[in-house]
A protein has these predicted regions:
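Alpha-helical transmembrane segments and their helix-start/interface "positive-inside/aromatic belt" motifs
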Residues: 2-18, 125-137
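N-terminal signal-anchor transmembrane alpha helix
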Residues: 6-63
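Hydrophobic alpha-helical membrane-insertion segments
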Residues: 16-28, 132-151
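Structural signal for the C-terminal ends of transmembrane alpha-helices
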Residues: 26-27, 117-124, 197-204
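Individual transmembrane alpha-helix segments
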Residues: 64-116
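Mid-length scaffold segments of soluble, non-membrane domains
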Residues: 108-112, 118-141
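Juxtamembrane non-transmembrane "cap" segments at the membrane-aqueous interface
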Residues: 143-166
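Primarily interfacial, aromatic-capped hydrophobic alpha-helices that serve as membrane anchors
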Residues: 165-220, 229
Length: 229
């Protein structure tokens, strides 16, 4: 039984997408390295009065504070924002905010785009070209989301202390919240879809033309033979 191009694409996507997500998670550490490097450059260059260090890898702790495992895809921040970490009613005990951010939350666009590209019936050279252009753009969008969350944790979640630090740095809390929502809710799904559509317009136009032609062909009927009168 012959499949239409759309069905062949959907079947290929059904096979390639799980594989792409598996590879993405298996190589999570190396794949987030460019993102963390970009985030480090932006945070330490733009707001050195807030951030002192950005490092890759963090320990996963249990409720008792014991190390369960070291996760190489996490990102650790060191800041200059000081908060009171003492229990309510206890003597003040101050410490710097050192949050951990998970860049993978913003990175599922990469396997989604890769799976769609691999499922599209184009030449191998064009597939490689799409990945070579698309992956760096996805890393930039991913870094935008990570930066938004980093600022949100340090300046919004920290309460009044964070608000004061934001005012000193000339940052708007509303703008930070907007950037965080945009980077978390919109970019991870929008970027791979737009990239795939832009890079594969010929294939999409083929699908549209075929869908427009097939219903017309299905309505054709043969003219009845001439009667004998």
């Amino acid at each position: 039984m012959a499949f239409s191009p759309l069905r062949r694409f959907l079947l290929a996507a059904l096979l390639w997408l799980p594989f792409a997500f598996f590879v993405w998670f298996f190589f999570a550490g190396p794949l987030v390295w460019p993102v963390i490097a970009l985030v480090r450059f932006v945070l330490l260059t733009a707001w050195p009065q807030l951030f002192t260090a950005v490092s890759q890898g963090a320990d996963l702790l249990d409720v008792q504070g014991r190390v369960l495992e070291h996760l190489p895809y996490l990102m650790q921040l060191s800041t200059t924002v000081m908060v009171d970490v003492a229990e309510p009613g206890a003597a003040p005990r101050f410490g710097m905010i050192e949050p951990t951010v998970n860049p993978m939350v913003y990175g599922y666009a990469l396997p989604l785009f890769a799976g769609l590209v691999l499922a599209t019936p184009v030449s191998g050279r064009w597939r490689l070209a799409q990945l070579a252009v698309g992956i760096p753009l996805i890393w930039i969008a991913q870094a935008f989301g990570v930066i938004g969350e980093s600022l949100k944790i340090v300046l919004i979640d920290a309460g009044p202390v964070g608000a004061e630090a934001a005012a000193r740095a000339g940052l708007s809390l509303n703008l930070i919240a907007l950037c965080y929502q945009f980077g978390y809710l919109i970019l991870p799904s929008l970027v791979p879809a737009v990239l795939w559509i832009v890079c594969n317009r010929t294939f999409i136009e083929l699908l549209i033309r075929r869908d427009n032609v097939e219903p017309v062909a299905a309505r054709r009927v043969e003219a009845p033979p001439d009667g004998d009168g």
